[in-house]
From Swiss-Prot:
Transmembrane segments: none annotated. InterPro entries: UPF0178 (IPR003791). Belongs to the UPF0178 family. This is UPF0178 protein GOX1710. It holds the Pfam family DUF188. HAMAP family: UPF0178.
Length: 175
């Protein structure tokens, strides 16, 4: 049986939660909000709140353990993205950038570079401001990713597995 796509949200600092709720409802997707503190979420059978204990990477650990190849993880956390990609889970940043096998190396290198620059005091800001263009880019990327995963799941349902392959004898075949 094919797994159903869920939206797993690293929610503590996620600026696009409202957008995620709307897109999840439009597609009928289960949305799991994971945080280390209680958050107000819309009342919906499709939205689940998971409050994990406080501590470094506890929410990340929960998401990484629960993620499947059918899911979409929404996070800005690069180490979490790397862990999810290892499980073939799709990863989307709140700015609409998809992190995949092709981009993860550059994203990781940029994270390490910026962290080093912050530690030396060469850079003092963490993130640029988040605006309408970022929200729009995120919505477009999330729609595209959901459609791609649905097509992939539909294709997987129509392609017979090797156990379903029918062998028709050809004249001259030896049983």
């Amino acid at each position: 049986m094919a797994e159903t796509t869920r939206l797993l949200v690293d929610a503590d600092a996620c600026p696009v939660k409202d957008e995620i709720y709307r897109v999840g409802a439009r597609y009928g997707l289960k949305t799991v909000i994971v945080a280390n503190s209680w958050m107000n979420i819309p009342q919906s059978p499709l939205i689940e709140r998971v409050v994990v204990p406080e501590g470094p990477d506890v929410a990340d650990d929960w998401i990484a353990e629960q993620a499947t190849p059918a899911d979409i993880v929404i996070t800005n956390d690069v180490p979490l993205a790397v862990r999810c990609l290892a499980k073939q889970t799709s990863v989307l940043r709140p700015n609409g950038e998809e992190i995949d096998e092709r981009s993860v190396g550059m994203v990781s290198a940029m994270r390490d570079l910026m962290q080093g620059l912050r530690e030396t005091g060469a850079v003092t800001t963490y993130n640029p401001s988040f605006g309408k263009a970022d929200r729009s880019r995120f919505l477009s990327a999330l729609d595209t990713l959901i459609v791609r995963l649905r097509r992939k799941a539909a294709l997987a349902r129509t392609v017979p597995s090797s156990s379903q392959t029918i062998h028709r004898p050809v004249p001259g075949d030896v049983p």
